[in-house]
C-alpha cells in the first residue's frame, strides 16, 4: 500500500485537497494493486482490495443507531475499541470489542439487490483508512473518546445518507466531517470507476445517444426522453463497474460528462474566453 500525503491540513488534521488529488492517489493505488483496472472497464473486488491490499479486516454487524438518527451503512475503527451493535438473538443492544483497522459493514447494506451500494460502502470505508488516519487514530496513552462522539474519535460511523447512492442529494460541505465524507466518496468512486476506463466507456454510450462531444446535456426543463436516456446509460455503467446507478450518475457529473444546459453553456463560454 502507498501512503497518502498532503501538504495542507485543517487543525483537526483533515486533509485540504482537491478532488483531483484524491483521484490521482486512488489511481496510484490501483496501478500498484491491479493495473488492469486502469486499462479496461471492470469490477473491482472491494473486499479483496480492503483486506488484501489495505491490510484491514472487513466484518459485518447490525450496527446500533438511535431510532431518531439516520441509518449507519458502515464504520471504520482505527484503534482497538468498542462499538454498539444489536444482538438479534438476544434482542438487545450490546457493546462488542473490535480490533484496530477493521471495517464494519452494517448487515442491511449487504441486502440482496444492493450489491452496488455495498461495493461503494466498503470502498468508502477504505477511503477513510487511507485518507484520515491522522484524524482518527489515537497514539498510545490517549483516552478513548468513543462515547463522546466528538471529531477526533478513533471510530468513524458513516450514515447511509452521506454516501453516494445513499438516497440523499449532495449536501453543502460545511463541517470537517462533511469534507471527510466527501473525500471518502471521491476515493470510493475513483477506485470503482477510475477516470481512464470510466470516461471512454461513458462517452461511447453518450455519443450513441447523439451527443457528439461525449457530454450528455440535460435540458433545464424536465424532459422524459432525456431522463430515460440518462437512466439507460447509468444502468449500463452500473452493470459494467459494479456500482449503483446513483454512484454512476454522480461520477458522470463529477467528470463533466453529465451537465445541465446552463452548465454546458457556461463551460463553453469559459473555453471561448480562454482561447
List each model region and its residues.
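Active-site hotspot residues in diverse enzymes, especially metal/ion-binding acidic/histidine motifs
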Residues: 1-275
Amino acid at each position: 500500500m502507498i501512503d497518502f500525503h498532503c501538504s495542507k491540513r485543517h487543525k483537526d488534521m483533515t486533509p485540504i485537497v482537491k478532488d483531483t488529488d484524491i483521484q490521482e492517489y486512488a489511481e496510484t493505488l490501483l496501478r500498484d494493486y491491479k493495473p488492469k483496472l486502469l486499462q479496461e472497464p471492470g469490477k473491482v473486488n472491494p473486499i479483496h482490495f480492503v483486506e488484501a491490499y489495505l491490510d484491514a479486516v472487513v466484518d459485518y454487524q447490525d450496527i446500533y443507531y438511535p431510532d431518531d438518527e439516520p441509518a449507519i451503512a458502515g464504520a471504520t475503527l482505527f484503534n482497538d475499541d468498542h462499538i454498539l451493535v444489536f444482538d438479534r438473538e438476544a434482542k438487545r443492544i450490546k457493546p462488542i470489542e473490535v480490533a484496530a483497522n477493521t471495517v464494519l459493514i452494517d448487515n442491511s447494506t449487504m441486502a440482496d439487490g444492493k450489491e452496488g451500494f455495498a461495493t461503494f460502502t466498503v470502498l468508502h470505508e477504505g477511503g477513510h483508512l487511507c485518507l484520515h488516519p491522522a484524524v482518527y487514530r489515537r497514539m498510545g496513552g490517549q483516552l478513548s473518546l468513543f462515547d463522546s462522539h466528538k471529531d477526533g474519535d478513533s471510530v468513524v460511523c458513516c450514515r447511509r445518507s452521506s454516501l453516494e447512492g445513499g438516497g440523499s442529494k449532495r449536501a453543502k460541505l460545511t463541517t470537517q466531517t462533511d469534507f471527510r465524507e466527501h473525500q471518502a466518496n471521491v476515493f470510493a468512486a475513483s477506485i470503482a470507476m477510475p477516470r481512464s476506463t470510466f470516461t471512454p466507456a461513458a462517452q461511447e454510450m453518450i455519443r450513441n445517444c447523439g451527443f457528439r462531444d461525449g457530454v450528455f446535456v440535460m435540458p433545464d426543463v424536465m424532459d422524459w426522453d432525456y431522463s430515460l436516456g440518462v437512466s439507460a446509460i447509468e444502468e449500463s455503467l452500473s452493470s459494467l463497474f459494479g456500482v449503483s446507478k446513483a454512484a454512476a450518475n454522480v461520477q458522470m457529473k463529477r467528470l463533466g460528462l453529465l451537465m445541465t444546459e446552463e452548465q454546458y453553456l457556461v463551460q463553453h463560454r469559459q473555453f471561448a474566453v480562454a482561447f
